[in-house]
Amino acid sequence: MRTNFARLAMLAMALMLVLSACGSAPAATQAPAVATEAPAMTEAPAATAAPAATEVPAATAAPADSGMQIPEVVDGKTNVAMVLIGPHDDGGWSQAHYEGLLYVEKNVPNVHVTYIENVPEGADSEQVFRSLARKGFNVIFGTSFGYMDPMEAVAAEFPDSTFIHISGYKTNGTNFGNLFGAMEDMKYLAGMVAGSRAKTDGNPKLGYMATFPIPEELRLGNAFILGARKTCPDCTMDVRWINTWHDPIAEKDGAASLFDAGADVVLTGADTPAVADVAQEKGKWGITYDYIGSCKVERCLTTIYWNWGPIYTKVINAIVDGSYKPGFDYFDADSGSLGLFGFMDGQTMTKGTADLPAEDIKMVKDTLAQMLAGKFTRFDVFKGPIKDNKGNVVLAAGVSLEQLDLDQFKEWNPDVKIGMYWWAEGVTAELPKLSQ
């Protein structure tokens, strides 16, 4: 799930150590509150339980230039820090990463883990990354698109620390790597579910509540409508831009706007389950994102979720044994780190999904099985023939987008051949204006 926009927080910061109810969770440092917020397996990944109690080091004052306190490292251990854009218990993006960190604490030998939450993108985050590196953290994860440039800058200053950026598209090949997953796989499947629901309800209008106009959001929105039109060829999709990753009020307002404009099903690209709560109030349907536990109300069709623990464990173990090579690591559904709730092994479909036409459910399951087997990837999601919503041919029959097309806009990078600055056929919204 993230993009660099204007600072949204006050300069005052406070320290908070968060302890898990079933043990001692990673130490957490509280950054300023902000209104913001970047993977299938045969067995469904379950929400990760907190590890057995371990010692949590007390946080100490950060260097004067950071304006906040930074946790201490533990001598003799592999020290891992994670920087979160939102609160660790947001019910979405940040909570999925936090539970991945708990998995690491339980499964990586001799590791010390900690996290800092609510860190704004931009200059504030650069100070946090620099302070963590100065403290001596061996591995530092940054979990928002807008941390990309700050992490790149700090990585150049601290060659003995390894920086892993989630989402984005930059790497230095030495100590700054990139990690993300093809959530377009799952959003394509979620589109099939949404299209089937809309068709069954007799209302072929869908909605997508998008965050920021970055390639990730257009990629995921396009995957959703492409999937929807497999089960509902007449379906259309409206879009609302809320310009935040994490703001429950803005998310509720955006969802309500789409429902009030006629949408039967709305998918969110933001962090919290707000879209499902609004769907419950209005008797419509919502699809949540990021976290396996976010689909709780009756009017939630499904959620597309990440299972970060195994991926994080693999990366940290590789760093420790010296085999990690910083680069661009982009995984598909066969990694075991992406899920579609209700369709993975051992899971039960929601009420709103279970009564859909049998042929549509079969299409979703068959496509998912191909994804899990590695036979259907992100390049199959974006394989022609595909037209944009103006009737122009984006991809001829049999032609797929390349990775660079998925990651960037042609308007931002002249090396991109096609890019993602287009809406697929069926989208009724105009393209967003791009910031430079």
Model-derived regions, located:
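Bacterial N-terminal signal peptides that target proteins for export
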Residues: 1-9
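C-terminal motif of bacterial Sec signal peptides marking the signal peptidase cleavage site
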Residues: 16-21
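A residue-level marker of the well-folded mature domains of exported/periplasmic proteins
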Residues: 26-27, 32-436
